[in-house]
Amino acid sequence: MKINDLLEKASTSSFSLWLLNFVLLRNIPFNKPHRLKIKSISKNKVLIHYPYIKNNLNHLKGLHACGLATVSEYSTGLLLLNHLDPDKYRLIMKSLHMEYHYQGKTGATASFELDTDWIKKQVIDPLLSSDAVFVDCEVKVSDDNGNHLSTCSTKWQIKKWDKVKVKI
């Protein structure tokens, strides 16, 4: 089963959402100790939970800044993949900028939204006349009490695979 099919099914089926979380935890080993969990996903929005567990805490017993960056980057990449076929397009993170607003002392949720029109205007149409495009995605992370913990701006480079010069 392709990732896009699983992403699509996860938006309407709790079993498929469980399966997506299961598959991603095992195929992205870096994220496994953090136990990131997709709470919901649709074509336009993703919510990913970052739990308040020992592996995710800093020396002050608050949510670790790097973990907040990870859940933010993960949410943007996942939703972009939900719109773009990974067999046709390559995504590479160019930069990530974090602003921290509040120390997290509970679990947190990253929220990212985009729509099909945005993908068409910012990615698909520009790639008709250019080898690569750069898109900025902004994610807000809030704790379980509704406090705004961080804002992340991730810049992605997106290319069609036939324009990639370095082969895997």
Language model region names:
Residues K32, I92, A108, V133-V135, ...:
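Hydrophobic core residues within well-ordered beta-strands of beta-rich domains
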Residues K32-K37, K94-E99, Q122-I124:
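Short structured motifs
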